[in-house]
């Protein structure tokens, strides 16, 4: 499994590609940051983010894209830019038919460090250890992108099993629904509630 992790942002959009399967050693294929100038127009910045992500998709051909799920923050301007970059990342993947997964920061931290409250230094240290790197990737956005990819590789098998179980449950439930297409509805028993019968000229 080859996953492109994307830590969305307008000024710095972290990108990292990791290859491997759950339970086996993982390999970093590449890591970097797509940068845009804060002085540029918003539209131009989004185009730059799109082009940068497209370049990574062209070069590394990932089978999956993992993007950090955006949460509301006190700084509305920051969260808006992050959400816009996230949308661009998902669009780039969807346009190529690449499955996209969203992971919360706490999910990523828990998957990589064992604690959903780990700080960036701890995440960077564990990414370095798990991928057998000489030093933590810089800036932190790059390390976060690799952590996203690692998280998805480890969580994907469980998520797939859960989705399959839910789909199977829905299918079996639909086939047993009374009155469904091809399924006869319940028959009424004479004298049961909701029915009437005539007794000696009067209705019972």
Swiss-Prot record:
Cofactors demanded by this protein: Mg(2+)
Signal sequence, start to end:
none
HAMAP family this protein is in? RuvC (MF_00034)
Binding positions for Mg(2+) 2? 68
| First-level EC class | hydrolase
Is Hydrolase a UniProt keyword of this protein? yes
* Annotated cofactor note: Binds 2 Mg(2+) ion per subunit.
* Residue numbers binding Mg(2+) 1: 7, 141
Active-site annotation? 7, 68, 141
Please report the organism this UniProt entry assigns to the protein. Answer: Streptomyces griseus subsp. griseus (strain JCM 4626 / CBS 651.72 / NBRC 13350 / KCC S-0626 / ISP 5235)
- Assembly mode: Homodimer which binds Holliday junction (HJ) DNA. The HJ becomes 2-fold symmetrical on binding to RuvC with unstacked arms; it has a different conformation from HJ DNA in complex with RuvA. In the full resolvosome a probable DNA-RuvA(4)-RuvB(12)-RuvC(2) complex forms which resolves the HJ.
GO BP annotation list = DNA recombination; DNA repair
Task: Give GO cellular component annotations, separated by semicolons.
Answer: cytoplasm; Holliday junction resolvase complex
Q: State the EC number(s).
A: 3.1.21.10
Q: Give the family per the record.
A: Belongs to the RuvC family.
- For this protein, what reaction is catalysed? Endonucleolytic cleavage at a junction such as a reciprocal single-stranded crossover between two homologous DNA duplexes (Holliday junction)
Protein's name according to its UniProt entry: Crossover junction endodeoxyribonuclease RuvC
Keyword terms of this UniProt record = Cytoplasm, DNA damage, DNA recombination, DNA repair, DNA-binding, Endonuclease, Hydrolase, Magnesium, Metal-binding, Nuclease
The membrane spanning regions, by residue number, are: none
User: Which Gene3D superfamilies does the record match to this protein?
Assistant: Ribonuclease H-like superfamily/Ribonuclease H (3.30.420.10)
For this protein, the record's PROSITE patterns field holds: RUVC
Any idea where this protein resides? Cytoplasm
Q: Which GO terms describe its molecular function?
A: crossover junction DNA endonuclease activity; DNA binding; magnesium ion binding
Q: What does this protein do?
A: The RuvA-RuvB-RuvC complex processes Holliday junction (HJ) DNA during genetic recombination and DNA repair. Endonuclease that resolves HJ intermediates. Cleaves cruciform DNA by making single-stranded nicks across the HJ at symmetrical positions within the homologous arms, yielding a 5'-phosphate and a 3'-hydroxyl group; requires a central core of homology in the junction. The consensus cleavage sequence is 5'-(A/T)TT(C/G)-3'. Cleavage occurs on the 3'-side of the TT dinucleotide at the point of strand exchange.
Region described as Disordered: 164-204
Q: Does the keyword Transferase apply?
A: no
